[in-house]
């Protein structure tokens, strides 16, 4: 059974009173799994962590939206399941020790592996409670090193789906729908193929963000570093770039244009808009990088066990890194 010391931040999740005996039994499989809470309080209700809590304006979110919600939520490790409540500990604050969690992902977790959390793909650990209309879906545990490839393939697959639904010709490789690790593969079809409106909104936002970041980055380099195109530099790497004999560099070297001041488009003298735009570009680039960066939530530590690999459904000791 999952357990933790009193130094952990303990949370009680109240269960509805009209659950059937069969539903109570099925809830017991949640022991050792991780639920994501929108806020951190000592007492929560089941509807705070069920699938409906991720809905946006009454519609089910796509995978990218669920992933963004995971970044804002707090992971709770379920330590015990009672008749009236779930006992859990927070992995975000406090000093939980002696943790025991369940591997809810398809990949093996090795001793010393960092473990990240993503929205579930497939219904392997889904618990449907018809009596109260709730669906509980624990987070999927995956090795942190697999996370970046998995997220990249999900977004690439969503891009292909976006092109297909908008009659944009594009070749779709079969490998975009699966990610493999240690001779085990995970099918990403369910995460990639969402609703039409959700996919349209998500991909348009993603494309706009990427294009804006690329355009702003080039604009800042051209504005703040005109000497890079016109003159030399003592840095060997920059000299190698300047010796590429591009048409832009040659024309700038011949004419040697003066550096022109960039005025504030609003006409005010309170700020220099190029530096504000540069700061905004750095912020957006950082956020795009954060989308693909998986932070570890747990680290597998098997002190007194001969087992070195934890398969799906098995439990393992862990610490918070």
Curated annotation (Swiss-Prot):
Entry keyword Signal: no
InterPro entries linked: Herpes_capsid_2
Any single GO CC term annotated in Swiss-Prot or TrEMBL for this entry: host cell nucleus
Subcellular locations according to the entry: Virion; Host nucleus
MF terms in GO: structural molecule activity
Pfam families the record matches: Herpes_V23
Record keywords, A-Z: Capsid protein, Host nucleus, Virion
Principal localisation: virion
Keyword Nucleotide-binding: no
Protein family per UniProt: Belongs to the herpesviridae TRX2 protein family.
Function recorded in the entry: Structural component of the T=16 icosahedral capsid. The capsid is composed of pentamers and hexamers of major capsid protein/MCP, which are linked together by heterotrimers called triplexes. These triplexes are formed by a single molecule of triplex protein 1/TRX1 and two copies of triplex protein 2/TRX2. Additionally, TRX1 is required for efficient transport of TRX2 to the nucleus, which is the site of capsid assembly.
Subunit record text: Interacts with TRX1 and major capisd protein/MCP.
Protein name according to UniProt: Triplex capsid protein 2
Organism: Psittacid herpesvirus 1 (isolate Amazon parrot/-/97-0001/1997)
Gene name per UniProt: TRX2
